């Protein structure tokens, strides 16, 4: 089992799964007298897959979101479902990587990375945020998957088919370790545990290798419409500092702008020069959302050219769709980390 893009390094263990496989045979069955496979209904209990929702009013609008004070519940779903609607593109990515992509029958309107282009013509079921419930129902799926952007739609989608929320702890944050746990759950659901374990091992090896090679300060930037958003440690893209080991060129507390902004703290070329990072790690949010690519053009200016990163050819352009749209699918994680590894390895 390999990724559809550049090869990976091999790697160790994965977090324990919170899944239980239940074979529903007759009460008189035993280990020596089990019902034949075609007479057995098999289900998988997916732990932490049902969020508790609460209604919120903000700026005159009312919407549903997860009440994180209430523990999540388990959801029982069919083993090896043959028809899946997913609003979570990380799930599409992972199912594709483990050979179960043909089970996906519907996805939201979204710009897909090239390696998922074969799914572009699937029936559309709304947006990442707003499902088209009628379109979902017409597809009659055995399983619906939501995450992060679509979590608030969990209850209504559950009225159509068994639904699981695979947001996990990361909730829109680049979190490879969390992504591996969710991938392992999908492996259990689809009977592809070995494929997930193999690809996850490769990713873990990438992480360990990068950690052994990282040196210097960094500034993580999203670029869109000629503007920059900077992310510090502990942010949705803080993984590059918190886990991989880059030293923040500017501490998160010292970044300007609105603390915790989903799009980062707005900074300027002059700010970047003053921070003078050894590495600039950038991704093109505009390109990820289908608004055209501008990151390299934006950073190609006489002010940024004076930074240590620019002078040492140490501006790293991450694959934007993988980092911003797909986020934590197996191939997306592999591609993002592969780009970083290639840069730091020289």
Where are these regions (language model features)?
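A short, structured surface patch at a secondary-structure boundary
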Residues: 83-135
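Structured C-terminal subdomain patch of bacterial secreted/periplasmic proteins
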Residues: 278-346
